[in-house]
Amino acid sequence: MNSKSSARAAIVDTVEAVKKRKYISIEAGTLNNVVEKERKFLKQFLSGRENLRIAARVFTPCELLAPELENLGMLMYRFETDVDNPKILFVGLFFLCSNAFNVSACVRTALTTMYTNSMVDNVLSMINTCKYLEDKVSLFGVTSLVSCGSSCLLSCVMQGNVYDANKENIHGLTVLKEIFLEPDWEPRQHSTQYVYVVHVYKEVLSKLQYGIYVVLTSFQNEDLVVDILRQYFEKERFLFLNYLINSNTTLSYFGSVQRIGRCATEDIKSGFLQYRGITLPVIKLENIFVDLSEKKVFV
């Protein structure tokens, strides 16, 4: 038996010993408090979920949020605009998918219906002027709190579990089924899956457009993930290279990959997201542990 198994067995024995203690009902509160703290600590340890997390709170216009208003566990991006006010905006993955080439026309229409106001059109126009999406847009975190007022207050988890405000429930990550990608030769063969967001580029009607994928793989090493993605996007990479040669552009890479976090294979569920009468098929990565990494580009 290795040290980890021995430690786990010792902890289980301690928990059972705590349950059998006869003095828990003693009215003298000091000893009872010690026992209660011990029980809570061991319960947290055994559950495998870290109590500490890294999160940030920001404000963004409510007009840029739609399903994010009613659903926690939505991936958010930080957008640096080219204007002085507002200088920084925060938009969701679903918002960016409304203009991604790898999303079907039907789903793009549904997303456009969700996000309907003049500000959305202006922000999308600014995003479309970027040479690369990542030049102005960067991964920020997963929503754990949304509070609406004159502006929306967002709390986004950058590392840790996506707890709600009371830390009673753990939420997952919700992504569109159309952009969900499993490039492994034998998907879901391991108990833990790593989640990445991938941005790639393609020439559409003589114009470069971005695509977004949420990738699920059993590989943690990002260099291996890049190799798998190179093989998966072999045709798209060839067409992109042809575009670079013919357009005399200064673009230098085909795509980028960045880790979002990890989750258990058994926690990957299919479902539907509903908002204002619109229903979209989604994948829910329940109990995801967010662990954002640095972006890695590839050609």
From Swiss-Prot:
The keyword Zinc-finger does not apply. InterPro entries: Herpes_1. One of its GO terms (biological process) is viral capsid assembly. Keywords: Capsid protein, Host nucleus, Virion. The keyword Repeat does not apply. It is found in: Virion; Host nucleus. Signal peptide: none annotated. Pfam families: Herpes_VP19C. GO terms for molecular function: DNA binding. One of its GO terms (cellular component) is host cell nucleus. Structural component of the T=16 icosahedral capsid. The capsid is composed of pentamers and hexamers of major capsid protein/MCP, which are linked together by heterotrimers called triplexes. These triplexes are formed by a single molecule of triplex protein 1/TRX1 and two copies of triplex protein 2/TRX2. Additionally, TRX1 is required for efficient transport of TRX2 to the nucleus, which is the site of capsid assembly. Interacts with TRX2, MCP and capsid vertex component 2/CVC2. Belongs to the herpesviridae TRX1 protein family. This is Triplex capsid protein 1. It comes from Human herpesvirus 6B (strain Z29) (HHV-6 variant B).
